[in-house]
Amino acid sequence: MDIEILRNYCLSFDDVTEEFPFGNDTLVFKVSGKIFLLAGLNNIPLQFNIKCNPEKAIELRESYDSILPGYHMNKKHWNTVIVEGTIPPHLIKEMIRDSYILVSASLPESRRKNK
């Protein structure tokens, strides 16, 4: 997965916007104004932070060396994913989708796309 594939996948979800609130080197994806993914544009290989269920976050970190506690984030709820070829592509997409769903579910009903 490269940054363009990541970007297109994130933008395929309902009510997603992309922004650069932390400078031009950090691409942020939000659902209804809440962050679900942050990607460092200067990182090689690609890496990004995603929200994760706390138990699942630990399980993923134990299974993959390239999944770490979220850099500059709440380590209980966020993981940093380093895309270096050791994580199956379907799992990367699953983690992104799960992050989107977690953040969407935390929104007040009035801000959810599908009420």
Each model region followed by its residue ranges:
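Charge-dense, helix-prone N-terminal extensions
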Residues: 1-115
